[in-house]
Amino acid sequence: MMESGVPPCAACGDDAHAACRACSYALCKACLDEDAAEGRTTCARCGGEYGAPDPAHGQGAVVEEEVEESHEPVASGVRERVTMASQLSDHQDEGVHARTMSTHARTISSVSGVGSELNDESGKPIWKNRVESWKEKKKEKKASAKKAAAKAQAPPVEEQIMDEKDLTDAYEPLSRIIPISKNKLTPYRAVIIMRLVVLGLFFHYRITNPVYSAFGLWMTSVICEIWFGFSWILDQFPKWCPINRETYVDRLIARYGDGEDSGLAPVDFFVSTVDPLKEPPLITANTVLSILAVDYPVEKISCYVSDDGSAMLTFESLAETAEFARRWVPFCKKYSIEPRAPEFYFSQKIDYLKDKIHPSFVKERRAMKRDYEEYKVRINALVAKAQKTPEEGWIMQDGTPWPGNNPRDHPGMIQVFLGETGARDFDGNELPRLVYVSREKRPGYQHHKKAGAMNALVRVSAVLTNAPYILNLDCDHYVNNSKAVREAMCFMMDPSVGRDVCYVQFPQRFDGIDRSDRYANRNVVFFDVNMKGLDGLQGPVYVGTGCCFYRQALYGYGPPSLPALPKSSVCSWCCCCCPKKKAEKSEKEMHRDSRREDLESAIFNLREIDNYDEYERSMLISQMSFEKSFGLSSVFIESTLMENGGVPESANPSTLIKEAIHVISCGYEEKTEWGKEIGWIYGSVTEDILTGFKMHCRGWRSIYCMPIRPAFKGSAPINLSDRLHQVLRWALGSVEIFLSRHCPLWYGYGGGRLKWLQRLSYINTIVYPFTSLPLIAYCCLPAICLLTGKFIIPTLSNAATIWFLGLFISIIVTSVLELRWSGIGIEDWWRNEQFWVIGGVSAHLFAVFQGILKMIAGLDTNFTVTAKATDDTEFGELYVFKWTTVLIPPTSILVLNLVGVVAGFSDALNSGYESWGPLFGKVFFAMWVIMHLYPFLKGLMGRQNRTPTIVVLWSVLLASVFSLLWVKIDPFIGSSETTTTNSCANFDC
């Protein structure tokens, strides 16, 4: 601050000192230096030079001032002032405002005299003009200095725009729902309602117009048609609200960051394999390599491989894979290649130079391909060596016997290959952790096949890494999209969506399928139509692979935002208007009551102990409660309480390995909730459907994620026999669930958390194998009608014609509109329809009988793992034929209908033209069956168009016997016709 009587700077108004010794004209130091820099050395008031002494007062008029800590004259030489001005100018160029320099207050002595003022031509004093120009220039200087400082501190415009965009993206949703257009969905729903009405009118006509001359045929057809109508309702209405979803991976990165300091959640990958001779180690290795190379922070990825066959071949091939990953992973990340499974990357028939501008790419790619070929040679050598097992068993490289020589009786084995303490890649970077796991097996213990292996991986991973999310893959499903994990995290880590999400399911996509997809291996209708419909309800079903789980959901917990239970429970959605007098307890409440009784008994026993602290008692009871659910492992129990995952920093790695061996022991799950309420659920060979159903019953919802580039791809059995056995396994699992306590028809009503349309979809999932019974009967009806001359419908009236046409038109229009909103092709739809009939009259029928026999007689069905394709020729496996009894029923139906068509035409030729009209309806019916079974017929012919002799003999024999018996018995001839014939025979005409 200035002292009293000292005026401020005449240019800028800041603290000033006397620049002119003659007239004491007040200027601040910055303005004085600015004048000096511009070459103005004369006073604006008196015209004298700055620093010149006043002739009246001499040298003593100015008192020395203190500037910072040194004493210097008020007016220094011009050279010194120019130097200071240039320094200030340099500071301004660097973006530092010159006015930030602080100065001490200066004491100016009073001046006794002031020089005369000089005027310009207009009569205005010159000093005033100069003061005004100073002020204007000062303002300009300040403005430019501020701009320079802002420019120096701010990033470039492009970066600033990107930063602002990232900041905005960080607060935006990570995904969004894209509803189907109303122009597509409204007509679709309207036609469904119309079809339902027409179906009711059709059934009314069919029931009220029996065919008395063929009453048995008519009754059979009506029962079959009613079942088909019921099956259509179960399949159709869960597709009422289909939706699409879109993810924003860039927003995920903006919110949680990337690299070492990323806030992305860790993920544990599970890969399961059993028999390396049927599941080639090279296929499993490609899956593992694609996981290790995913586009995700390496310290947040762990890969666990479950070897349920305890094969040394799997162990050794995994060791080779870990070594090859040191070269493969940095190559993938350096050039951002897709897919990151080397077998499928190098076999692509595309221009691999597209979008690759790095000059060394071609050279490194060629070298990497050579390394991979050498790696394949080593793996194939291991496979060739494993074809013949030594009598003394396998010996490891250190000379000790392989612990898993007996796959049914061996200890648990764990080996960590890569990770934080393991080998690094050739660029010196850390690699994701790779862990080999083979759970303990002993005679007399139930191991629960794949479900038991997955639960063992859940416990091992919880002890070693405890990532909050788990992504499981079959050994033949590789990561096709390196950003697949980020796609899943867009749902899981979105606060507005992920709280109630138990899993994110990706669609299955396949390689190596023939172009026409003869046996509907792609299953496009299910993955692109049904699953989208379920996503609009409570979420898609779990299909066993390509699924990212929330670990806490696998532990049997409900969603965090679970609403309060209703006051009363209902037995079914259809009887909600008839409430019970007393609400039944839900399963969770009954489980809680039983647990409370156990705890009370435990408390009673503890109270008998003298001097037992209450706090210690409560802690012990809590520990006992967790042990009853999760097993006897304090480390694992502690991990279940960590919702965000992670392992305690104080944990000793060697101790954790010992604990991991303990949790995969064969008796660990005894007297616990594993397989009942926790983990993968036991009780069916299709544990995936059962596990997802239990989660949905607890109130969780699931998400269906369909990225533009498929997340995962796998292989499918493309030959007829293997495909039918795969369908047989799925159908048997559904029958097992239908006959168990977890049947959706009666399970899970207590909490009321399963939406009724979602329940319909689960009912359809477990009921569809039983459609094989009416389907086989219906497929035999055309041949029977042609052989007997009867038909299942009477002569059509005008009204009946309208109902039939209305039903056929509604079926066609519904299918067309479904294709329209889903985007699938008509060929995929037709292949699905064909294989629905093929599977229904073969695999589904066997599944029904096997499931019933298993329940009644306790006969367990052992399924072998489907062998993966090994034929080097394109689609070579398509023509491989393997004999199986499943082929007999559809072959018999084919032969029977062909015989019926021939017999029908022969009868029409003998009977005259009046019988041709009814014949066309019967022949059309038979041709409908033959057209649906045509892919099956091609599969029987094989590459050489030859059907195996045994199949031909059995089918012709059955069809011939059936036809002869039918013609001999002729059970559908009316009694009146018989009486007339007998009377005529006794009358002598």
From Swiss-Prot:
Residue ranges, compositional bias (Basic residues): 138-149
UniProt keyword annotation of Signal present: no
Binding positions for UDP-alpha-D-glucose per the UniProt entry: S272, K278, E279, D308, K449
Entry cofactors: Mn(2+); Zn(2+)
Reactions it catalyzes: [(1->4)-beta-D-glucosyl](n) + UDP-alpha-D-glucose = [(1->4)-beta-D-glucosyl](n+1) + UDP + H(+)
Coiled coil: 362-389
Designated name of the protein: Cellulose synthase A catalytic subunit 4 [UDP-forming]
